[in-house]
Structures are given as C-alpha cells and as structure tokens.
C-alpha cells in the first residue's frame, strides 16, 4: 500500500491517470483467474493466496486487474490496494472497449466480460465465437 501511494503521488503517473478520462477507445485483454501453464512457468502470475481468495469470491476473470464473477459483477479484492491500474468506473466510461481473448480456457471469463459490460467489442478465434453463441448449458 505504501509503495502504491508513493507511486500515485508521482506527477508523471498522476498525469497518465488523468488522461484515462479522455480515452475514447481501450484495447484490453481478458484474463482468466486460472493462469496458463506458460504464465505459471514464467512466474508471471499472482501469488497462490491471491488466486485462492479470488476463486473463493467467485472470480472467473479480469480486465485490467478488475476481477469479476460469472455474471460479470465486480469481485472485491485487496489487490486494489497493491496494484496500479484503471478502475471499473473509469474503464466502463470509455465509449469503446475492445476485448481480446480466445481459447477454451477463457470461455467463462470472456462470456462474463461481455455480460458484465467490461468490453463491448470482442476479438477472438472462431471456436470461441461459436462457443459463445451457444446457449449456456448445452
């Protein structure tokens, strides 16, 4: 928290954060709470305790470290106090939010991101698009 607060007080970072409110388009990745084998092997993943806590709260995915459940509803996390990034309200105020993701491992996260309004345009692969068009439970 202390490091985060120090960074937030930096004029360069403050200026970047102010620019977020002027964005008209955002290109974002849609992440799954369960990290891929590649991310795990590279060490580029959240600590296990954070992943467990997110799973316990029903999180299935994230956009810009804003975690959400299967219905797309925001899932509170103490990561907010330890990370820097665009918050839900600022992100959702951007008129065009383009999500990029694909693969079977991310189907639940992608569906939730669309349902929750985290993105309004999706770039994905054909298999994922077909899966998303199927009624759930079939």
What are these regions (language model features)?
Residues 1-138:
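Conserved phosphate- and dinucleotide-binding cores of soluble alpha/beta proteins
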């Amino acid at each position: 928290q202390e490091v985060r607060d120090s960074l937030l007080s930096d004029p360069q970072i403050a200026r970047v954060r102010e620019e977020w409110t002027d964005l008209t388009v955002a290109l974002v990745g849609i992440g799954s709470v369960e990290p891929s084998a590649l991310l795990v092997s590279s060490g580029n993943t959240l600590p296990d305790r954070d992943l467990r806590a997110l799973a316990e709260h029903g999180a299935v995915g994230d956009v810009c470290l804003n975690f959400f459940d299967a219905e797309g509803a925001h899932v509170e996390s103490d990561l907010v106090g330890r990370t820097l990034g665009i918050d839900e309200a600022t992100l959702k105020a951007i008129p065009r939010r383009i999500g990029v993701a694909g693969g079977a491992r991310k189907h639940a996260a992608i569906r939730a991101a669309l349902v929750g309004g985290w993105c309004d345009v999706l770039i994905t692969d054909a298999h994922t698009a077909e899966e998303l068009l199927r009624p759930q439970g079939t």
